Each structure stands twice: as C-alpha cells, then as structure tokens.
Amino acid sequence: MRDIDKHDIDKKELSETDICDQFITPALKQSGWDQRRQIRREYSLTPGPIIVRGNMSVRNKKKRKFADYVLSYEPGVPVAVIEAKKNTHTVSHGLQQALGYAEILDVPSVFSSNGDAFASHNRAAQPGQEIESQFPLADFPTPQELWQGYKAYRGIEESSDQLLLQPYHTDGTDKEPRYYQIEAINRVMEAVVKGQQRMLLVMATGTGKTYTTFQIIWRLWKAGKARRILFLVDRKRIPEVERLFQVGFSFF
C-alpha cells in the first residue's frame, strides 16, 4: 500500500471554488487569457423556470443554469466553456454538463477540470481529429488558438475580424446583452461577413428585440458596414424605441 502524499489530501479537501482559484484560473492566465476581459466566472445562462400556480408565479432559482467559466475572445464573443469539479471527481467528470452549456452558447470548445489537468471535447472536430482528449494545466490553448477554432467552426474567413470583434455599445452601467441576444447579434454579424443580404430574427415578447436590434445597428455602423439605416416599428412601441435610440445614438 503506497504512502498517501499530503498534497493529495489537501487538494481533495479543496472546494470547487478553491480548485478554480488555485488551479484553473492561474492556468488560463498563464496561457494568455485576460482575467478582466476574457474570463467570466459563474456565467448565467438561464435564471430558472417560472412555475405558475393559479394567479401566482414564482421562479425556481434552484434550477438556474450557469457555466463555471465562459471564455470570450473579445467581450460578447464567447468561444469556449469550462466546467470545474472538485478534485474528488475525475478530470472529465464535468464534460457532459459543459457540453450542454456549449450547445446553448453554440461554441465549439468544451473543457472540464478537477485541478489536475484539463479534459476537452471538440464539437468542431474534422475527420481524423480527436474529439476528446486530456492535457496538462500548463497546455491550455491560447485565446488566438480558440478563436481560430471558433472561426473554423462557424465557417468564417480570416478577413472578417473587424466586424465580428466590433465592441458592443455600453452605457456605463452593468447592463449587457443576455446570452441569447449575444447569439442573435453575432449570428447576424457572421451572416453579413458571409455576404448574406437578408436575415430574419424571431424573438418572443419581452426578450429584448429593440435592444438586440440597436446593438446590431451599432456594430454595423461602427464597423463602417452600414451608413443609412431604416428602422420600422409598430406605433405602439415608438416611445420605448425613442428612449433607447435617443440614448444610444447620441454617441454617433
């Protein structure tokens, strides 16, 4: 029976947060990921389902979904998901959970770690390429490597970076696009760089259609892809639209 190393005991006693702080985040920073701009911890995906009972409704926050890490090449351009687990689990234990989040965000690179190493799943693997693998913490891919993988996954040409990486409009508050708004906005940008002339977004009431449209217009205008824009809206929505556009377009 082999002697148990003290370091092993300490590591297995660490919480999931400790694993993130002491092993995963340092590994990401070592590979060139900017902690402020590119690394998001506990990224909220869904706030939980709403349960209706008669005339009352309540949100079940226990079933909310959030990713331990979402990596973005630029803010608002997610390229990878990482799921962290305690060291009592295997390296790949969180891959299946991370895959679900990656499908929501539609990103190709999926990772899991227990602090010992990384396990990866490549949703964009080509014939002959490995779909899943494991590698040391020190070998995590750089931002440029995952960005190239994202562009290959989306079928985007090298010359398209200017529009795809055009920053979102910010108003100095904490407000930012929700994950599905980011998905819609980025898909429109990708369609434009591929030469599509017509795009249709179908969004339900209350999902932020006006805000999403404004961000699309902002990014197209700032990237020099659109100079004359006609925005049509139902007359009942005019006051709401005016408020948003007066604030947003005061910067133009």
Q: What residue spans do the PLM features occupy?
A:
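ATP-dependent helicase/translocase motor core
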Residues: 1-228, 233-252
